[in-house]
Swiss-Prot record:
PANTHER family the UniProt entry points to: SENSORY_REGULATORY PROTEIN RPFC (PTHR43047:SF78), TWO-COMPONENT HISTIDINE PROTEIN KINASE (PTHR43047)
Source taxonomy: Bacteria, Pseudomonadati, Pseudomonadota, Gammaproteobacteria, Enterobacterales
Cellular component GO terms held in the UniProt record: plasma membrane
Record PROSITE patterns: HAMP, HIS_KIN, HPT, RESPONSE_REGULATORY
Protein name as catalogued: Sensor protein TorS
Cytoplasmic side: 1-8, 354-914
Chain ranges of the HAMP domain: 354-407
Gene: torS
Post-translational modification: Activation requires a sequential transfer of a phosphate group from a His in the primary transmitter domain, to an Asp in the receiver domain and to a His in the secondary transmitter domain.
Record-listed 4-aspartylphosphate modification sites: 733
Disulfide bonds: none
Regulation: Inhibited by TorC apocytochrome.
Membrane-crossing segments per the record: 9-29, 333-353
Histidine kinase domain ranges (all copies): 450-664
Catalytic activity: ATP + protein L-histidine = ADP + protein N-phospho-L-histidine
Length: 914
């Protein structure tokens, strides 16, 4: 039978689906049976267990409430316990009814519950009666106590009156005795004794009897009544009789009537005793009921326990039934799974493998041979599969198409080869054009570099000679001429630098370097204006600054480039201002720093304002200049993230505004000390082929105490180093007659590793040159260079110490020594060496592991320690390290230098003290 591949697969899948459906139905039936058994057991067992537990809890609560009911001493507690008993009784009855509906025999428990309920109702009624009796006892007792107190008060009043009367009679007796009326005095004395004093005693007895009755009533209690009721009644009866007898002897009719009325209330003591007697009887009855309740509850608990045992037995039977049903379901599912697995294997082998998989594998191998290039390979038998027959016919058609495509591909290959040859010719032409452009650019750069070198070298001779001549006292008369030579040379150097900056900007700005360091804006502006002040001498021009008070003390940026831009703006203002003023302003505007140069010069036509920032554009050719200053300044402002703009009014003046991002510096500004550098005893090797440059450099360095040996080429340098004493450093010119300076530096670095190499060149020192020579030279000194700058750069590159006292705040140390003595500073230095210096090792370890928090803590401790010992530069470096723990320079060298300086300062102090 020639079935299609789809039908064969459908047949196999249908058989597997039927097998899956059968397994599902059998499994569903077993699970449903187990679920039904579990449901029946759950519905029957769990509720009965819960009801048994609730029944036990309810009986316990009922017993607890019954005990509390007996001891209830107020109506609120009595009602609360009664409600609890009622609720628990109803709950027990409901649970018993539910258990009875489940088929349990609860007759004995119900009868026991009925007896307990009757006993509890009787107990509740007795407790209520007892509460009423005690309320009546309290009210009657309070009335009797109040009446007795009133009698005592009235008796006290009568006694006081009688005492007053007796006092008057006594006074009269004394008068009669003085009048010698003996008989009258004796008669008055008899009356005093027989009547007045006797009456006082009777009233006092009345008061005491009333207080005794009051005390007896107040001391009455249930326990006393139960023990000695007849005696208490007799004592109260005697006391009341005394009160009644003394009441008759009261002379005042009104008081006597009032006491008689009050005695009526006191006479109700017998009723009070009767109430206490009833209370005692009820309490005894309640005690008997409580004991009976305990016995009944014990019997009730026994019946409940038997019921719980019955429930547990039924639950065990239900669980056993559930386990049997579960086991039967597991066995049936296991058997069905094995049968299904066998049937599935048979279906996969017979339908899928023989009819589908194996023919497809053979067909795939044939197709792979076809793809590998064996186009004439035969196809296997299709085993009567319609789709595979179709694939065979398609492959025959594919063979024909492949032969046609091969012929077409050969034709296309010939066309592509021709086109490729044409493209290669175009690429060669393009490369030649680009090479010519690059060659022209390199020639331009080489020309500028050569011109820079050729101009800077004689400029160094001019400026250096002028500076040396200016130091000669014999030439004071020609000082103005020397100043003119120096100014002209510096102007020429400025023009040369402008041309080089413009060349770098025109090349895309790759060689225009902009630094980012902290600086102080106010001193920078003031010093720049001060440098320009010499150019206004003898001219009617006023230079002024207007720096806002809210200017930050320190900013981040490139102070050298900012000074260059401002100097250019001030130079233009001086060039175009004949008289009036030039004001340098500085202020902040939001997140920007504004520097303005305003003048009262000739002004600029508004139509030309847009052109003045273009290269080689001049407002007036009569004023001089190259026309590059504003172009360079504008591009430098852009490189620093700002802009340069201008406003002007002809014949009024102009205002140029430099806008830069306002970034307040968090690190301290390094302090610079402008003083002469001493290089005493320092041996330097000068490798320079220009004799004039040699002579000027030697003369400049001799004034600082250095020992200079000059050679003219690389061979002489190598010979001198080999035959002479060691040199501290070598100044290497880049252009030497035999080999270039960089190649010589590589040889010197290999042969003399301890020799410090310093570049000394008139070449353009751009970023590319610095990167090429950074591994060879400690630094590069450009020519021309002033004498002071030359000495400072040498000291910097050689890491010399200009003045040890610069590392210390001497005034602070002097004050501390005056207040506490140098011995204390010695102790501080020892503590600093023991505890602070080890922090430097911790900083190195933390810097290696990039642990910024640990660096901050150590830097903060070092900052405080350095500040306390007057090491102000080291303290600033530590503060900078605390702010920038992973990028700031390390203070190790400065701290070592400061410790040495402090030791020298202390040694000097000790010598002075001796």
């Amino acid at each position: 039978m020639n079935l299609t591949l789809t039908r064969r697969l459908w047949m196999g899948f249908a058989l597997m689906a039927l097998l899956t459906l059968t397994s599902t139905l059998v499994g569903w039936y077993n699970l449903r049976f187990i679920s039904q058994v579990e449901k029946d057991n759950t519905q029957a067992l769990i509720p009965t267990m819960n009801m048994a537990r609730q029944l036990s809890e309810a009986s316990a609560w009922e017993l607890f409430a019954a005990q509390n009911l007996t001891s209830a001493d107020n109506e609120k507690m009595w009602q609360a316990q009664g409600r609890m008993l009622t609720a628990q009784s109803l709950k027990i009855n409901a649970l018993l009814q539910a258990l009875r509906e489940q088929g349990f025999d609860t007759t004995a428990i119900e009868q026991q519950e009925q007896e307990i309920s009757r006993s509890l109702r009787q107990q509740g009624e007795l407790v209520g009666q007892r509460l009423q009796l005690r309320q009546q006892q309290q009210q009657l007792s309070q009335q009797i106590v109040a009446a007795a107190d009133e009698i005592a008060r009235l008796a006290q009043g009568q006694a006081n009156n009688a005492t007053t009367s007796a006092g008057a009679t006594q006074a009269g007796i004394y008068d009669l005795i003085e009048q010698d009326q003996r008989q009258a005095a004796e008669s008055a004395l008899d009356r005093l004794i027989d009547i007045d004093l006797e009456y006082v005693n009777q009233m006092n007895e009345l008061r005491l009897s009333a207080l005794r009755v009051q005390q007896m009533v107040m001391n009455l209690g249930l326990e006393q009544i139960q023990k000695n009721a007849p005696t208490l009644e007799k004592q109260l009866n005697n006391a009341v009789k005394i009160l009644q007898r003394r009441q008759i002897r009261i002379e005042d009719p009104g008081v006597r009537a009032q006491v008689a009325t009050t005695l009526t209330t006191v006479s109700q003591y017998s009723d009070l005793l009767a109430l206490y007697q009833q209370d005692s009887e009820i309490s005894n009855h309640l005690q008997t009921l409580a004991q009976n309740n305990i016995a009944q509850f014990a019997q009730f608990s026994s019946e409940v326990s038997q019921l719980v045992d019955t429930i547990e037995l039924r639950n065990q039977h239900g669980l056993a039934h559930l386990e049997k049903a579960s086991a039967r379901g597991q066995y049936s599912l296991l058997l069905l799974g094995m049968v299904s697995l066998c049937a599935l294997i048979l279906i996969l082998w017979r339908v899928v493998y023989r009819s589908v998989t194996r023919p497809l594998a053979e067909q795939t191998q044939a197709l792979q041979r076809l793809l590998d290039g064996d186009i004439d390979s035969p196809f296997p038998e299709t085993a009567g599969v319609r789709e595979l027959d179709t694939i065979g016919r398609l492959m025959d058609a594919f063979r024909s198409n492949v032969h046609a495509l091969n012929r077409h591909r050969e034709q296309l290959a010939a066309q592509v080869k021709a086109r490729t040859a044409e493209l290669q010719e175009l690429v060669i032409e393009h490369r030649q054009a680009r090479a010519e452009a690059e060659k022209a650019s390199q020639a331009k750069s080489a020309f500028l570099a050569a011109m820079s070198h050729e101009i800077r070298t004689p400029l160094y001779g001019i400026l250096g000679t002028a500076q040396l001549l200016a130091d000669n006292p014999a030439l004071n008369a020609q000082r103005d001429d020397l100043r003119a030579i120096t100014d002209s040379g510096e102007s020429l150097l400025t023009i040369l630098n402008d041309i080089l900056d413009y060349s770098a900007i025109e090349a895309g700005g790759k060689n225009v370097s902009v630094s980012d360091e902290p600086f102080e804006p106010r001193p920078l502006l003031e010093s720049t204006l001060q440098l320009m002040s010499g150019r206004v001498k003898g001219r009617p021009i006023r230079l002024a600054t207007a720096i806002a008070d809210d200017m930050p003390c320190a900013l981040m940026g490139d102070p050298r480039r900012i000074r260059q831009v401002i100097t250019n703006l001030l130079s233009n203002a001086l060039r175009f201002t004949d008289e009036g003023y030039i004001i340098l302003r500085s202020r902040t505007d939001g997140e920007q720093w504004l520097v303005e140069v305003e003048d009262s010069g000739c002004g600029i036509d508004p139509a030309k304002l847009a052109e003045i920032f273009q290269p080689f554009v001049q407002v007036s050719g009569k004023r001089g200049g190259t026309g590059l200053g504003l172009t360079i300044s504008s591009r430098l402002a852009q490189a620093m993230g700002g802009e340069l703009s201008a406003t002007s009014t002809p014949e009024v003046g102009s205002c140029f505004c430099l806008r830069l991002p306002l970034r307040v510096a968090t690190a301290p500004v390094p302090k610079t000390v402008n003083q002469a550098v001493r290089l005493d005893g320092l041996r330097l090797l000068l490798i320079e082929d220009n004799p004039l440059t040699q002579r000027i450099t030697i003369e400049m360095l001799k004034t600082s105490g250095a020992q200079i040996v000059a050679v003219g080429n690389a061979a002489q340098a190598l010979e001198t180093l080999q035959n002479s004493e060691p040199f501290a450093a070598a100044l290497v010119d880049f252009d030497l007659p035999d080999i270039d300076g960089i190649t010589l530096a590589r040889q010197l670095a290999q042969q003399y590793p301890s020799l410090v190499l310093i570049g000394f060149s008139a070449h353009v020192i751009d970023e590319t040159l610095r990167q090429r020579t950074s591994s060879l030279f400690r630094g590069i000194i450009p020519k021309p260079v002033p004498r002071e700058v030359l000495g400072q750069l040498l000291a910097h590159y050689l890491q010399l110490q200009v003045n040890n006292d610069q590392s210390l705040d001497v005034s602070q140390l002097n004050e501390d020594a005056q207040l506490m003595g140098t011995e204390k500073i010695h102790e501080w230095l020892v503590l600093f060496t023991q505890h602070a210096l080890p922090l430097l090792d911790e900083i190195d370890i933390a810097r290696a592991s990039q642990d910024s928090e640990k660096i901050k803590r150590a830097a903060h401790q070092l900052k405080s320690s350095c500040s306390s010992l007057g090491m102000h530069i080291a303290s600033q470096l530590c503060a900078q390290l605390e702010q920038q723990p992973l990028s700031a320079p390390l203070p190790h060298e400065e701290i070592t230098r400061s410790v040495a300086a402090l030791e020298a300062w202390l040694h000097k102090k000790d010598l002075n003290a001796i």
